[in-house]
Amino acid sequence: MISSEAMPFASTGGLADAVTSLSSALIDNGHNVKVLLPRYYGISRDILTLFDGQLCCTNKIEDIFVSVYTASIQTQKNNTLEFYFIDYEKYFGRDGIYGTVDNPNYDDNPQRFSLLCHSTFQLCRELNWFPDIIHSYDWPTALISVLLKFYERKNPEFSNTKSILTIHNLGFQGIYSKHLFPTTNIEWKYY
């Protein structure tokens, strides 16, 4: 699962509950599930464990190195649900998940959540864990399906991986200027 929100760590509404509830139910039914989300400013590093090494996510301008943290919770059947947090201060070390009260949408949200999506594949490689399905939620993680189809499926480890996108709130579509598209590290032909 990849999401911008998950309980009990980051929430603005029902999305966080849905992500954690579904992940927990799948774990309790014998599936191997991991949840990936950003380590926002409001998620204290004190409650997380630093994962060994950094991930390198290359965009067209620079190599971005992100730290990864982990945490876990117990499900209703006392199974362990693992969470992985992408930590990059420039994008996620600020108040608010998507923006602030005065500015509800950060101007760099496309870059922020693109980094999260690109990090997904790097983290899977680092864990040597290649899921059957990558389930993404809402516009912040919708890029996963594009990355999988046009880039990652060429790699043998993701050749059988499928993607699911669940929309929880159609009112938030992540519509930004097309001039920001290159910052997602996706070729123009896919615009």
Report residues per predicted region.
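Catalytic cores of nucleotide-sugar-dependent glycosyltransferases that transfer UDP/GDP/TDP-activated
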Residues: 1-191
